[in-house]
Amino acid sequence: MYRGFNLTITDEDFEDLKKNEMFRFRTFLRKLFNKVVEDGLQKYLIDKERLDGDVMMEDWFPNVDADIFISHSHHDLDKATALMGYFQKFGLSSFVDSYVWKHSDKLLKLLDNKLCYNEDRNTYDYGKRNQTTSHVHMMLATALTQMMDKCECLFFLNTPNSANPKSDISKKVYTHSPWLFHEIATFEYIRKKRRISKYAAEGNTNFSLD
């Protein structure tokens, strides 16, 4: 991660941004990337009571190559998609979790039905439910942190869906989502890499550190 940007997109900006092929094919993209796991948890089983978290994390929240991390409310997915298409015109790839990762709630439902459900009482075990939620949320938080560290920069879409409208973008941002809070907080502490720029001048190859 090199730098972060707090971005406010107006309705007029959005109208211009969504004029790209990626935005027009957004429904197809969601169906392509948001696949439902059909084989349940069988592939993750170590034994009757243990699951392989590493394999599960690689399957549900894989680490991919991307230049830009777009932090957004899921209610602003269309805006994130439009921005992703805009960056693509410049040869820059963007990470938008909804397109690359499966939904954590679906994984939780699979785990809870497998490990926490009591058929005799037709209820879920409260303690076990807390454990599955903790494990899945920790995997997701770890995956988000890894992707943020890997990307060149972060764009936070500052909208009424993601932040308190009264927030002063020059100061603190008050968010409604625990995941957006995690991303904003992580950016404050994540390592800031020195960016190396390469350019040629009069036949000589030079390097500069920004």
Predicted regions and their residues:
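Conserved TIR/SEFIR loop-to-helix hotspot centered on a Trp-containing motif
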Residues: H135-V136, S162-K193
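Acidic, Ser/Thr-rich peripheral helices and adjacent loops at domain boundaries
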Residues: N113-T123, F181-A185, F207-D210
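Short catalytic/ligand-binding loop motif for oxyanion handling, primarily in non-cytosolic enzymes
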Residues: D78-K79, K102-K106, S162-S167, T205-S208
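Glycine-rich, N-terminal phosphate-binding loop of Rossmann-like dinucleotide-binding domains
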Residues: N158
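Charged, low-complexity C-terminal accessory regions
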Residues: E58-F61, R191-D210
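Conserved N-terminal substructure of TIR/SEFIR domains
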Residues: Y2-C151
